[in-house]
Amino acid sequence: MFNKINQIFNFHQQALNLCSQRQEILSANIANADTPGYKSIDFNFKNELNKTLYKNKKTIFLKKTSPNHLNEKHKNLFLLKTIPVLTNQIKQDGNTVNMDRERIEFLNNSIKYQSSLVFIKNEIKNMMYVLKG
């Protein structure tokens, strides 16, 4: 029983982590909408979720030689397989950010994040109800 509960929470924990990382990527795309030569990137959420749930995690240890280097919270970004967003709307300056697509994906990602939070909240509420009798 506890193993099943752990699996449910692990799934949603991984989904929340990936949603958070995707939100950072989408935010970077939106922030760089006017940056000449910027190439919009994303990752396949379903593939990355399956990879984190069903395969052994590979840990990358980075050596910090300066306090200005990336901190620990960014290390998981290196494990994601980011891909360039294919678009037929390339600006004259080489920028490939499509703001309509980015806004829609940002909204969809936010909905996934909120859905996982609501599911976790309801599961905890149900467990508390059962335990109280």
Curated annotation (Swiss-Prot):
InterPro entries: Flag_bb_rod_N, Flagellar_basal_body_rod_CS, FlgB. GO terms for cellular component: bacterial-type flagellum basal body, rod. The basal body constitutes a major portion of the flagellar organelle and consists of a number of rings mounted on a central rod. In Gram-negative bacteria, at least four rings, L, P, S and M are present, whereas Gram-positive bacteria lack the L and P rings. The rod consists of about 26 subunits of FlgG in the distal portion, and FlgB, FlgC and FlgF build up the proximal portion of the rod with about 6 subunits each. Keywords: Bacterial flagellum. The keyword Metal-binding does not apply. It is found in: Bacterial flagellum basal body. GO terms for biological process: bacterial-type flagellum-dependent cell motility. This is Flagellar basal body rod protein FlgB. It comes from the Bacteria. The keyword Cytoplasm does not apply. Structural component of flagellum, the bacterial motility apparatus. Part of the rod structure of flagellar basal body. It holds the Pfam family Flg_bb_rod. Belongs to the flagella basal body rod proteins family. It comes from Buchnera aphidicola subsp. Acyrthosiphon pisum (strain APS) (Acyrthosiphon pisum symbiotic bacterium).
